[in-house]
Design a protein with these regions (language model features):
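Serine-hydrolase catalytic machinery in alpha/beta-hydrolase-like enzymes
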Residues: 11-103, 199-202, 206
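Alpha/beta-hydrolase fold nucleophile elbow
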Residues: 102-114
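Glycine-rich nucleophile elbow surrounding the catalytic serine of serine-hydrolase chemistry
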Residues: 112-122
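A conserved short beta-strand
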Residues: 131-145
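Short beta-strand/loop motif that positions the catalytic acidic residue
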Residues: 156, 162-164
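Conserved alpha/beta-hydrolase "acid-adjacent" motif
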Residues: 169-174
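Catalytic histidine neighborhood in serine/cysteine hydrolases
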Residues: 182-197
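Catalytic active-site module of serine/aspartate enzymes centered on a nucleophile-bearing elbow/loop
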Residues: 202-231
Length: 231
């Protein structure tokens, strides 16, 4: 792989006794990389996440969509909501990126949906943003930040965008509570008329537009930990 090649390949990440399947797409001379964490009952084949990923790719951002659970694990409802396990699996994917010499130097963002957003927020709290192995930005789509710990929400330094559908009222409340706890640069964006899966006309397009803008802003020039950020 060189800087000027378009790369699209399937990958496997070995974690303990499991193999996680992933789809890697790296445009020529990428601005940065975004790792996707899907929600419960979904997978790397999620049409919604793939739509957002395609918009990121069109704007020069590489993407890795990964299955955080094996097929057998995903059949167990309790495992789907095991945020600690999902976070560990997401961390393994970050480590895979950081060990891949072709993409390891690029700024890294996380895009999480539903329970995957909780894992992304948990993981972001463990990395010092701006460092070589840090997380440069986080975007949550219909996320469940209530499943992340309060300590994690207060610890995150990566700029974080929370996107929620205007008709997803219970999740709006959960995101509003998380927003108050967070001390990083942050934004809560409500998409009018959208439900939890953003299936309404134009809703997913708006999500993609917001995600592209957020990642282009922060992957191109990550905020260093000692820089002043909005509270």
């Amino acid at each position: 792989m060189t800087r000027h090649q378009l790369v699209h390949q399937s990958i496997r990440i070995h974690v303990d006794d499991a193999y996680l399947e992933g789809d890697l797409h790296v445009p020529p001379s990428p601005v940065g990389m975004v790792l996707f964490a899907h929600g419960s009952g979904s997978s790397r084949l999620s049409p919604r996440n793939n739509y957002v990923a395609a918009r990121l790719q069109e704007n020069g951002i590489g993407t890795l969509l990964i299955d955080l659970l094996t097929a057998d694990e995903d059949r167990d409802f309790s495992i789907r909501f095991d945020i600690e396990l999902l976070t560990l699996r997401l961390a393994a994917a970050v480590n895979w990126i950081r060990l891949n010499e072709d993409i390891q130097s690029h700024a890294l963002g996380l895009f999480g949906a539903s329970t995957g957003a909780a894992a992304a927020l948990q993981l972001a709290a463990f990395y010092r943003q701006g460092q070589d192995d840090g997380i440069a930005a986080v975007v949550s789509r219909g996320g469940r930040p209530d499943l992340a710990s309060q300590e994690a929400l207060q610890t995150i330094v990566a700029p974080t965008l929370l996107i929620v559908g205007g008709e997803d009222r219970s999740v709006i409340s959960l995101n509003e509570q998380a927003y108050v706890l967070m001390r990083c640069e942050k934004r809560l964006q409500i998409i009018p008329g959208a439900t939890h899966l953003f299936e309404e006309s134009g809703a997913l397009e708006k999500v993609s537009e917001l995600a592209v803008s957020w990642f282009l802003r922060y992957l191109a020039s990550p905020t260093l930990p000692n820089q002043k950020i909005a509270r």
